[in-house]
Amino acid sequence: MAPTLKLQCHFILVCLLALRGESRYLELREAVDHDPFPHLAGGASPKRELEGEPLYRRALRCVDMLSLQGQFTFTADRRQLHCATFFIAEPEEFITIHYDLVSIDCLRGDILQVFDGWILKGEKFPSSQDHPLPTTERYVDFCDSGLSRRSIRSSQNVAMIFFRVHEPGNGFTITVKTEPNLFPCNIISQTPNGRFTLVMPHQHRNCSFSIIYPVAIKISDLTLGHLNGLQLKKSSAGCGGIGDFVELLGGTGLDPSKMLLLADLCYPLRGPAQMKVGCDHTVLRMVSSGKHINRVTFEYRQLEPYELENPNGNSIQEFCLSTL
């Protein structure tokens, strides 16, 4: 992977780390210090908005990442040509971005675009194979649609905006809210440890669960139509000829379609399947024909430094390969 893309993927990793624990305090403290709505500084809360509580507000940086609902304002203090904000919600949520106020000069080359998912140097999540819309329809350009599309909802728990502002003082204000997603499909995990169940009820689509960490992952339950158990098949045999299966992918980029197939599961197996993946990015992907109700339950944890320092001794092979 190119050094620039690797650096940007590491930026996402740093941002995800900053969303956890004490690191979040630093972001919120900085947000309060730069709050463009000082009269609400004392009442703004980093928690998700509750009914009757004031809307959380803060300024946006040129490059930013948010996991909070609220109202966010970007005002250019100088010419800003390469800006982006990454949004991430809980796995079971959609993200809605609403334009409250936009003051940009489209004729001069300003840009304000929403992208349904995340994209870095052409690598997308969800991939083109997994998203219900073609790539061109995943972009919503304010300069093309104006306020006729004032609210834009994502198809999964991540979204982003790109913007370019030439004139100092110009910018925009958006309100970000989340809505429940009864059957979450494509997901980026905010945390390096967790447990999740992907369910796809009679829908012909693919779902990817993304973990941007090296992890140990254990698949404890798999239901693919009439199958009740698990079998791990080496990728040379493959499950591609079967309409419903689960893949484990590893890589260093963002796009699951460009990642290495480590293993696939499509037949019964006694007991859980467990493996360690030393890649920067691990994806569990479920392919569904639409003929069945498919379900996979798994848990994952971030690998410890000592496990990565001695990969062969900890069942982690080279080139991000995994073993049982």
Swiss-Prot record:
Q: Name one GO molecular function term.
A: corticotropin-releasing hormone binding
GO terms in the biological process aspect are:
behavioral response to ethanol; cellular response to calcium ion; cellular response to cAMP; cellular response to cocaine; cellular response to estradiol stimulus; cellular response to estrogen stimulus; cellular response to gonadotropin-releasing hormone; cellular response to immobilization stress
- Tell me which UniProt keywords the record has, alphabetically: Disulfide bond, Glycoprotein, Secreted, Signal
User: What GO terms fall under cellular component here?
Assistant: axon terminus; dendrite; dense core granule; extracellular space; microtubule; multivesicular body; nucleus; perikaryon
Q: Its principal location?
A: secreted
Question: Has the keyword Signal been applied to this entry?
Answer: yes
What protein name is recorded for this chain? Corticotropin-releasing factor-binding protein
Originating organism: Ovis aries (Sheep)
Q: What is the lineage of its organism?
A: Eukaryota, Metazoa, Chordata, Craniata, Vertebrata
